Amino acid sequence: MKLLTTDYPSPGTVNHYRIDSEQRRWVEEYQGKVGLMDLKAMVAAMASDPCWSANLHGLIDFSDVELDLSANDILRLALVLKHEEHRTRGWLVYVANNSTVFGIVRMLSYWSRNSERLRIFNTREEAETWLEHNMDQTPPNFREVESSEAAAALRNVI
Protein backbone atom coordinates (compact mmCIF):
# COMPACT_ATOMS: atom_id res chain seq x y z
CA MET A 1 0.00 0.00 0.00
CA LYS A 2 1.27 3.46 -0.86
CA LEU A 3 0.37 6.58 1.13
CA LEU A 4 1.08 10.04 -0.18
CA THR A 5 0.37 13.39 1.39
CA THR A 6 1.03 16.33 -0.88
CA ASP A 7 1.13 20.07 -0.46
CA TYR A 8 -1.83 21.97 -1.82
CA PRO A 9 -2.37 25.65 -2.47
CA SER A 10 -5.26 26.10 -0.02
CA PRO A 11 -4.36 26.90 3.58
CA GLY A 12 -6.21 24.80 6.14
CA THR A 13 -6.64 21.91 3.73
CA VAL A 14 -5.23 18.44 4.29
CA ASN A 15 -5.59 15.97 1.43
CA HIS A 16 -3.96 12.63 0.84
CA TYR A 17 -4.44 9.43 -1.08
CA ARG A 18 -3.25 5.88 -0.95
CA ILE A 19 -3.20 3.25 -3.65
CA ASP A 20 -3.69 -0.35 -2.61
CA SER A 21 -2.98 -2.56 -5.62
CA GLU A 22 -3.75 -5.76 -3.72
CA GLN A 23 -7.26 -4.52 -2.85
CA ARG A 24 -7.57 -2.99 -6.35
CA ARG A 25 -8.54 0.45 -5.09
CA TRP A 26 -7.39 3.89 -4.17
CA VAL A 27 -8.64 6.02 -1.29
CA GLU A 28 -8.73 9.82 -1.29
CA GLU A 29 -9.27 11.65 2.01
CA TYR A 30 -9.90 15.36 2.40
CA GLN A 31 -10.11 17.65 5.43
CA GLY A 32 -10.89 21.34 5.72
CA LYS A 33 -12.02 23.74 3.02
CA VAL A 34 -11.39 22.15 -0.38
CA GLY A 35 -11.56 23.98 -3.71
CA LEU A 36 -11.09 23.21 -7.37
CA MET A 37 -7.29 23.57 -7.30
CA ASP A 38 -7.04 21.07 -4.42
CA LEU A 39 -9.11 18.48 -6.29
CA LYS A 40 -7.29 19.00 -9.59
CA ALA A 41 -3.91 18.71 -7.84
CA MET A 42 -4.99 15.42 -6.26
CA VAL A 43 -6.17 14.04 -9.62
CA ALA A 44 -2.89 15.04 -11.27
CA ALA A 45 -0.78 13.57 -8.45
CA MET A 46 -2.57 10.23 -8.63
CA ALA A 47 -2.43 10.06 -12.43
CA SER A 48 1.35 10.55 -12.33
CA ASP A 49 1.83 7.91 -9.62
CA PRO A 50 3.45 4.75 -11.06
CA CYS A 51 1.06 2.62 -8.96
CA TRP A 52 -2.01 4.23 -10.62
CA SER A 53 -4.14 2.04 -12.86
CA ALA A 54 -7.42 2.76 -14.62
CA ASN A 55 -8.60 -0.66 -13.42
CA LEU A 56 -8.73 0.42 -9.78
CA HIS A 57 -11.89 1.29 -7.86
CA GLY A 58 -12.01 4.58 -5.97
CA LEU A 59 -13.23 5.55 -2.51
CA ILE A 60 -13.36 9.33 -2.06
CA ASP A 61 -14.02 10.47 1.50
CA PHE A 62 -15.58 13.94 1.77
CA SER A 63 -16.92 13.36 5.30
CA ASP A 64 -14.69 15.99 6.95
CA VAL A 65 -14.68 18.69 4.29
CA GLU A 66 -16.31 21.90 3.23
CA LEU A 67 -16.36 21.95 -0.57
CA ASP A 68 -15.81 25.42 -2.01
CA LEU A 69 -16.91 24.84 -5.60
CA SER A 70 -19.08 26.81 -7.99
CA ALA A 71 -21.15 25.09 -10.68
CA ASN A 72 -18.47 26.12 -13.19
CA ASP A 73 -15.76 24.56 -10.99
CA ILE A 74 -17.70 21.29 -10.91
CA LEU A 75 -17.99 21.30 -14.70
CA ARG A 76 -14.25 21.97 -15.06
CA LEU A 77 -13.38 19.14 -12.67
CA ALA A 78 -15.76 16.77 -14.48
CA LEU A 79 -14.02 17.48 -17.78
CA VAL A 80 -10.61 16.87 -16.21
CA LEU A 81 -11.87 13.53 -14.85
CA LYS A 82 -13.06 12.54 -18.33
CA HIS A 83 -9.55 13.04 -19.74
CA GLU A 84 -8.01 9.68 -20.62
CA GLU A 85 -5.08 9.73 -18.18
CA HIS A 86 -7.43 10.45 -15.26
CA ARG A 87 -10.23 8.04 -16.15
CA THR A 88 -10.97 4.88 -14.25
CA ARG A 89 -12.97 1.86 -15.30
CA GLY A 90 -13.85 0.93 -11.73
CA TRP A 91 -16.53 1.93 -9.26
CA LEU A 92 -16.42 5.40 -7.72
CA VAL A 93 -17.69 5.40 -4.14
CA TYR A 94 -18.08 8.71 -2.29
CA VAL A 95 -18.67 9.48 1.36
CA ALA A 96 -20.79 12.63 1.70
CA ASN A 97 -22.35 13.15 5.10
CA ASN A 98 -24.30 16.34 4.35
CA SER A 99 -26.72 17.48 1.67
CA THR A 100 -24.43 20.14 0.18
CA VAL A 101 -21.58 17.72 -0.48
CA PHE A 102 -24.09 15.11 -1.70
CA GLY A 103 -25.48 17.60 -4.25
CA ILE A 104 -22.01 18.57 -5.47
CA VAL A 105 -21.04 14.91 -5.94
CA ARG A 106 -24.27 14.26 -7.88
CA MET A 107 -23.51 17.22 -10.18
CA LEU A 108 -19.97 15.93 -10.66
CA SER A 109 -21.25 12.45 -11.52
CA TYR A 110 -23.66 13.88 -14.08
CA TRP A 111 -21.13 16.13 -15.82
CA SER A 112 -18.38 13.51 -15.82
CA ARG A 113 -20.89 10.92 -17.11
CA ASN A 114 -20.22 8.58 -14.19
CA SER A 115 -23.76 8.30 -12.79
CA GLU A 116 -24.07 4.59 -13.54
CA ARG A 117 -20.90 3.61 -11.71
CA LEU A 118 -20.92 6.09 -8.87
CA ARG A 119 -22.41 5.51 -5.43
CA ILE A 120 -22.74 7.97 -2.54
CA PHE A 121 -22.93 6.94 1.11
CA ASN A 122 -23.38 8.77 4.42
CA THR A 123 -20.59 6.92 6.24
CA ARG A 124 -17.20 5.50 5.39
CA GLU A 125 -18.23 2.13 6.80
CA GLU A 126 -21.22 1.89 4.44
CA ALA A 127 -19.06 2.87 1.47
CA GLU A 128 -16.33 0.34 2.26
CA THR A 129 -18.85 -2.45 2.83
CA TRP A 130 -20.62 -1.75 -0.48
CA LEU A 131 -17.33 -1.59 -2.38
CA GLU A 132 -16.10 -4.87 -0.90
CA HIS A 133 -19.32 -6.62 -1.98
CA ASN A 134 -19.26 -5.15 -5.51
CA MET A 135 -15.54 -5.10 -6.24
CA ASP A 136 -15.72 -7.98 -8.73
CA GLN A 137 -18.67 -6.60 -10.70
CA THR A 138 -18.08 -4.48 -13.76
CA PRO A 139 -19.79 -1.09 -13.51
CA PRO A 140 -22.75 -0.84 -15.93
CA ASN A 141 -22.68 1.16 -19.13
CA PHE A 142 -19.02 2.04 -18.96
CA ARG A 143 -18.24 3.97 -22.11
CA GLU A 144 -14.72 4.50 -23.35
CA VAL A 145 -14.20 8.10 -24.43
CA GLU A 146 -12.18 8.63 -27.56
CA SER A 147 -9.00 10.52 -26.72
CA SER A 148 -9.69 13.20 -29.36
CA GLU A 149 -13.12 13.88 -27.81
CA ALA A 150 -11.63 14.14 -24.31
CA ALA A 151 -8.73 16.32 -25.50
CA ALA A 152 -11.10 18.76 -27.22
CA ALA A 153 -13.23 19.03 -24.09
CA LEU A 154 -10.17 19.54 -21.89
CA ARG A 155 -8.76 22.29 -24.15
CA ASN A 156 -12.03 24.19 -23.78
CA VAL A 157 -11.84 24.07 -19.99
CA ILE A 158 -8.22 24.76 -19.16
Which residues are covered by each model-predicted region?
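Amphipathic, Lys/Arg-enriched alpha-helical "gate/interface" segment within cytosolic domains
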Residues: 2-158
